[in-house]
Each structure stands twice: as structure tokens, then as C-alpha cells.
């Protein structure tokens, strides 16, 4: 009968601590191994395929996961935040190391984290990069606005000063040399980022399936663009992994809004250790959604009056997230609502 093993790996930048336990939990080996793929595979070569290997979902886990999964090991990903709490309660230690990870997996107490398939992870990376470039561009544009404000240029004759006509306006401004060079430098960077964004978008359109039914559903939400819809689908993954809207809200960090009744709404703080990409998209979309959805606009005004505009935007983002949960679960398009909360348009199912 083949011996049963449980392996835990505490991943560091240059090395990993690798612990091997037997079926009874006895530590057979616990040593430091350099993060060199051939060395790691050589060290693990005595163990049979499908041997469970547990890693924490920390920065840089992907290469290790791919390496070991590609060589027949069964990968388990642990939730870093929860693993310490469970370790304290079950095996009486607050030290999360390779042995701890292996013990938690062996005893079925491991708090698992979602392990996306490589193709989903690659799609996320592609879409996240585009989003980061868009944010960089937005930051540079804000810097130009700040420079112009320093020189008393507070009002513009055009709506978009970064379009063709707007660029002509910027070129015509009589700015001192130091400010002119600053504006021109930022514009040059914006042009470079524009090029990279277009290049990324071309790659996304060629690599990500255009007929993504889930993304098409999310496009019916006011304020959600094509690329935002794709990123939401990639970040959320299979909606079935969330048993309730509350679990999805916890995953995205939009748990601060709790409707106690029709008349009371509590606004708490956002969870920082959560999916910031989904959270960012929905908070950005909230501004557009309240302009299109009468029900959301009424809700926004009510919260803004009591708690302020920023918390109202987060509350709207939370409502959008709950809608997304049921849209994906039930294959439904988005429904606009009357100020009373009742459906304004009923699209039914697709």
C-alpha cells in the first residue's frame, strides 16, 4: 500500500521551507530549499503524484503552484488571514509555517482560498494591467489640472482638454517655462499610455472570448463598460462558489452597507483585504448608474443626505453587486427601478 504524505510549503522570495508529514501527522522532513525549480522538483521527486501540497495565497504563489501542479501534485491554496485563526483554535499555535499548513490540510481544517485556473488567472492579469494603465492616465490628467490651477487656469472653453481641440487649447496657453515643460511632459506620458492601452485592448479582444454571455449580461448595468464587464467576470469567477450575496460582498469588500429595514441603512467601513478590482469598478460605475436608474438615484440621495456622498457611492456599489449576484445566478439582465424600488423595466431572462 502506497504511503500517504502531506506537504506544506512556506514560500519566501529566495527560498521555501518545505515540510513533509505522514498520515499520522509525524514530521518526516522539514528543510529549507532554494526557489530553483529543478532543485524543488528534485526534493519532491520521492513523493507520488496527487500528493497534496499546501501553499498560502501570498504574492508570488502562482509560479510555485503552476510548477507543482504541472508535475502531478495536488495543490491546495490557503487563505492567509483565516489560516492563523484556525491554527490557533485547532492545533494550538499562532505560528503559520510549513508544518502548520500541512497539518491543517491533513486534518481537514484548512481554510481554502480560491485557486483560479491558469487561463482565468491570465485573463485577470491582462485586464488588470489595462485597468492600472487607465488609472495611471487618469492620475496624469489630474496632475495637469493641478498645474493649470496653479496658474489660474480654472475654466476651459472645451469639455475635454485632452481631445484634439483641447490639446490645441493647451498649446495656446501662455505658461511660464517650468509649467509648460511640466504640462508637455505629462501629455507625452499620456500619449505613451494611450498607445499601451490600445495595444492591451487589442490583445484582450483577440484572446478573451467575445461571446462571453456573463459579460453580456453585466453590460446591461448602467456605467459598466465592455472591459469592466470582462474584468468583473474574471474576478468573480463561477458565481456558484458564493452561496449567498453576503459571501460575494465579503469577497469584494463591499460589506459596509447593511439594510436593516426600508427606513434604516447602516454604513460601515470597507474591507481592505478583499478584491479591490471589483470594488473599484463598482464604485466608479455608481456615478453613472445613479444617472440612469431612478431607483438608485433616490437611494443615493437618501444616503448622501444622512452619510455624505462618498458613503452613498459605496452603498450604491453594494446594491449593484447584489444585482450582479442574482443576474449571474439567474441569467437575468439588469432591471432599472422606480424610486419606490419596484422594477421599471422587466427584461425577463435571456
Residue ranges and their predicted role:
Residues 17-38:
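Short glycine-rich, Thr/Ser-proximal phosphate-binding strand/loop in the N-terminal lobe
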Residues 35-52:
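Short, basic/hydrophobic alpha-helical segments
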Residues 50-58, 101:
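Acidic beta-strand-to-loop metal/phosphate-binding motif
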Residues 131-217:
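Glycine-rich, often acidic, oxyanion-interacting loops/wings at catalytic, nucleic-acid
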Residues 263, 299-350:
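Low-complexity, acidic/Ser/Thr- and charged residue-rich accessory regions of DNA metabolism proteins
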Residues 76-128, 264-274:
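Short alpha-helix plus adjacent loop in nuclease-associated cores
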Residues 217-220, 226, 230-310, 344-346:
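Phosphate-backbone recognition surface of nucleic-acid-processing proteins
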Residues 2-22, 101, 133:
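Gly/Thr-rich phosphate-binding beta-strand-loop-beta motif of the actin/hexokinase/Hsp70
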